[in-house]
From Swiss-Prot:
It comes from Saccharophagus degradans (strain 2-40 / ATCC 43961 / DSM 17024). One of its GO terms (biological process) is tetrahydrofolate interconversion. One of its GO terms (cellular component) is cytosol. PROSITE patterns: SHMT. It comes from the Bacteria. It catalyses: (6R)-5,10-methylene-5,6,7,8-tetrahydrofolate + glycine + H2O = (6S)-5,6,7,8-tetrahydrofolate + L-serine. This is Serine hydroxymethyltransferase. Homodimer. Its EC number is 2.1.2.1. Keywords: Amino-acid biosynthesis, Cytoplasm, One-carbon metabolism, Pyridoxal phosphate, Transferase.
Amino acid sequence: MFDTKQTLDAFDPEIWQSIQDEAQRQEEHIELIASENYTSPMVMEAQGTKLTNKYAEGYPGKRYYGGCEYVDKAEALAIERAKTLFGADYANVQPHSGSQANSAVYAALCSPGDTVLGMSLAHGGHLTHGASVSFSGKMYNAVQYGINPDTGLVDYEEIANLAREHKPKMIVAGFSAYSQVLDWQKFRDIADEVGAYLMVDMAHVAGLVAAGVYPSPVQIADVTTSTTHKTLRGPRGGIILAKANPEIEKKLNSAVFPGGQGGPLMHVIAAKAISFKEAMTDEYKAYQKQVVANAKAMAATFNERGIKIVSGGTENHLMLVDLIGKEYTGKDADAALGAAYITVNKNAVPNDPRSPFVTSGLRVGTPAVTTRGFKEKQCIDLTNWICDVLESLENGNSEQVIADVKAKVLAVCAEFPVYK
């Protein structure tokens, strides 16, 4: 029998302290990593429930273990809410992550050795879109497309030519570092021309899609995948969506279980259901509109300060800051901003002369600061502070500038707490 009066801080003070330190970091640092966000207390509450105790291999109504009648209800709610939220005919809410969702789609629609056409990691794609170090580049014949280095935009003619040349079994559309709107229909047309499946990975923009501020790929692609965190602001996990196709739906279910996973995480699935319900509210739609407005304000301010943005601006939640030609690297900028309590991530940019571990760019995103309550004014101020730090790296006065900016960050974070 468990003693429910026993406390974590008393039993395991080391882990407790790590949790408290991270909570303090989240409150006192400005989070600009484009893939990060703060989830709601209700989502976190669900993840800490007794649902974590239940094994539920299989799907609702078709489990391998007994005692699943209540977790069946939770998963059925998550499935129906996901379908309603995204206008999908099919949803699988069991993938533990976005990468595992993508892996399941590859397994369902392709065979090892098949050709897959995806966006290069160096140009803004994801590891699972064919990178050589990923399963997608090791198990499949990965052909990579990129962006036009002059415009910073996806080159659809290049994609069409590569598709005609290599005849891929599947084309992957989506990104982890691209600031413009992808034309899902153009990808569909290219896929149809060469007889390929079209998979869209909308992990970065799923929240924007749910709110109607970014075009939906769900009824255009054969299969759409996403994480449930990032802009969607739910728990860490994955999801697979599709338009009606019984044959593909059966393959997808089998690829997730038993093909790639065993028991689903029922406490996380319940949290996913909560986040989908949150995403149906008017407040959530207003939040996503503000995410884009804040990103546009930041991009415009970078441009005004003479800091180049790849593609010139943004139409979503993120932007790539191009530091090619600067005396400092993306790694240097990342570290300096981190010392000022501004968290970003170094990122490769098109034609980057530096290694992926050093880079000549930064990726910046607004989902987390918008959750804090930042509007355009705070984001403009923040961008100016970032530019001050970057300029100080060239002017030799970075120590004082970083200290000044850190003080401003602490003040604005106190004014806009994450969790009241």
